[in-house]
Design a protein with these regions (language model features):
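A short amphipathic helical element positioned immediately N-terminal to and/or at the very start
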Residues: 1-18, 121-122, 126, 234
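An intracellular "coupling" helix at the cytosolic face of ABC transporter transmembrane type-1 domains
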Residues: 12-13, 111-112, 128-137, 141, ...
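Transmembrane helix-loop-helix hairpins at lipid-water interfaces of multipass membrane proteins
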Residues: 18-82, 159-164, 275-279
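Cytosolic ends of transmembrane helices, especially the final helix of ABC transmembrane type-1 domains
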Residues: 220, 244, 292-319
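Hydrophobic alpha-helix/TM-entry signal in multi-pass membrane transporters
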Residues: 17-22, 62-69, 117, 135-136, ...
């Protein structure tokens, strides 16, 4: 993780983008939380009218609530795309900074460094490491950051209604993090070995294509093809235990999360049944719990992307 933070610090000139993305993401998260409250009001209004026909006609109230829902969701959609635009430009700038600095560092290295390196491997390492880092940052800023902010707000809101709900929701993240930590160390070992084979294979490919006349003059086509194929065969052999380990642990994470949500739904249903929550409040809380579940279900993918980014950033600074 330190190497990934080092990448962010190395692009510190982009701090206006960092601030803008955080600010817009905060607004998106806030607007996303408006919808459950409006649905609560609409549900309770309709239930009250159905239960007591003598109440005033709530049609106008329901219509205005629907208009408010549209306004909140439309504004959130606009801001989400503004945040996406800022994130895309920021990532392009980070790619520019990292690529330029990598090239400048290579130009400053002495000739003896290149005597022990395959040129294509250097190029492959640059492409892979920067691609992994920028893809993770782009996904985090465009999708995961607003969700995390929403989760914090949801924990505060559920604590107001019934604190055991907050405890169960809050348990999801340390549990997921702990199980991921058990997975990550072994996964990184596999990934490092796999990246080395990919870099070496792509490096040989670039070298052979760049000097194809020399390759043919020595009749080395078959030998080079065998070397290239061997590296990618190795990646298949490494991927099998790596993927088996990752998905077995991901299954464990998923079952643990489902058990926690079983407790959450039992609390919501039973407390509504006994009159502690109105039907509207139950609908609101279910929607908020579902919103909190989304970043948790995405966490496997985020962690996978983060691990690739960490491995890539580590390779980036090894030159």
């Amino acid at each position: 993780m330190q190497s990934l933070m080092r990448v962010v610090r190395s692009a510190s000139a982009l701090w206006p983008f960092y601030i803008a993305v955080v600010a817009v993401s905060t607004l998106v998260a806030g607007l996303g939380l408006v919808t459950p409250f409006l649905l609560r009001e609409a549900t309770d209004t309709i239930v009250a009218k159905l239960g007591d026909a003598t109440l005033p006609d709530p049609t106008q109230t329901v219509i205005w609530l629907a208009v408010a829902l549209f306004a909140a969701e439309a504004m959130a959609s606009v801001l989400r795309n503004v945040s996406g635009y800022l994130g895309d430009v920021m990532v392009a700038r980070i790619r520019q900074i990292l690529s330029t600095r990598y090239f400048a560092k290579l130009l400053a290295l002495p000739q003896r460094y290149y005597d022990n390196q395959v040129t294509g491997t250097i190029i492959a390492r640059l492409d892979r490491s920067i691609a992994n880092v920028t893809q993770f940052i782009q996904s985090f800023t465009n999708n995961f950051l607003p969700m995390l902010m929403q989760v914090v707000a949801i924990l505060v809101i559920t604590a107001y209604y019934y604190w055991p709900l907050t405890v169960l929701l809050a348990l999801l993240f340390p549990l997921y993090t702990w199980l991921t930590a058990l997975t990550s160390k072994r996964w990184q070992v596999f990934e490092k070995e796999k990246n080395a084979n990919i870099d070496e294979g792509n490096g040989r490919f670039a070298e052979v294509v760049g000097q194809v006349k020399v390759t043919k003059s020595y009749g080395a086509e078959v030998r080079e093809l065998e070397k290239f194929g061997r590296h990618y065969t190795n990646t298949v052999d490494i991927t099998r235990p790596q993927s088996r380990w990752w998905h077995s642990m991901d299954t464990l994470r998923g079952v643990a999360m489902n058990l926690i949500f079983l407790g959450i739904y039992l609390i919501l249903f039973t407390r509504t049944l006994h009159g502690h929550f109105t039907v509207g409040e139950m609908v609101m809380l279910i929607q908020m719990v579902t919103m909190a579940r989304q970043p948790v279900t995405m966490m496997s993918w985020i962690v996978d992307s983060a691990q690739r980014a960490i491995a890539g950033s580590r390779d980036y600074f090894q030159v």
